[in-house]
Design a protein with these regions (language model features):
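Short amphipathic alpha-helical segments
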Residues: 1, 5, 55, 59, ...
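A short hydrophobic/aromatic micro-motif that marks alpha-helical segments and, especially, helix-coil
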Residues: 4-5, 84, 169-170
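His-Asp-centered acyl/peptidyl-transfer active-site segments
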Residues: 7-118, 150-154
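Extended, hydrophobic beta-loop-alpha segments that form or line the acyl/peptidyl-thioester binding
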Residues: 12-19, 51-53, 72, 121-171
Length: 171
């Protein structure tokens, strides 16, 4: 969010399409119907706001939007189009984010100490301008997985994003 503000001349009003956990229980998988998997997360944060205050502001916004994960996805798209007057098949948000706070561990005594590692392979057809997935590793680190449209962005853009994110996080 801070990086998007930086590259947009200090814009305080930033919206990121924040992914909500997918259907995770057997009942949710077999219930039918539709459920939104993402929701716009809009925050207006001034440059004078300290890092922790901004983080809590974003967390509070996320907690409010997660309550609405049972909305119809088509309804949300229509509402966004009405509010921001976006053309058909476009989006107000240029960045999509999934944050997975827990490392994946297989709880199976038959596997003993065999470690599991999942690696994502994109098919090269990025449907969003930029989509970032952040997940934890078993050793306490983090994985950053970037998917982006090469017609609009280059690998150097992702390197800059990563560089500034690390400066922001570890400043």
């Amino acid at each position: 969010r801070t990086y998007l503000s930086k590259v947009n001349n200090g814009q305080e009003d930033i919206t990121i399409q924040n992914f909500i956990s997918r259907r995770s229980t057997h009942e949710e998988w077999t219930s039918g119907g539709s459920r939104t998997i993402m929701f716009p997360c809009r925050t207006v944060i001034s440059p004078e706001t300290d890092f922790l205050s901004a983080a809590y502001e974003i967390q509070n916004m996320q907690n409010r939007i997660y309550m609405h994960s049972n909305y119809d996805p088509a309804f949300i798209v229509d509402e966004m189009r009405k509010r921001y007057h976006t053309p058909e098949h476009t989006s107000y948000e240029s960045c999509y984010l999934t944050y997975q706070p827990m490392p994946v561990k297989v709880e199976n005594e038959m596997l003993g100490t065999i470690r599991q590692h999942a690696k994502w392979f994109a098919n090269g057809a990025a449907t969003k301008k930029m989509y970032l997935t952040v997940s934890h590793t078993e050793d306490g680190g983090m994985n950053f997985s970037y998917h982006y449209q090469t017609a609009h962005l280059e690998e150097h853009d992702m390197e800059l994003l990563y560089y500034y994110m690390m400066r922001i996080l570890f400043k």
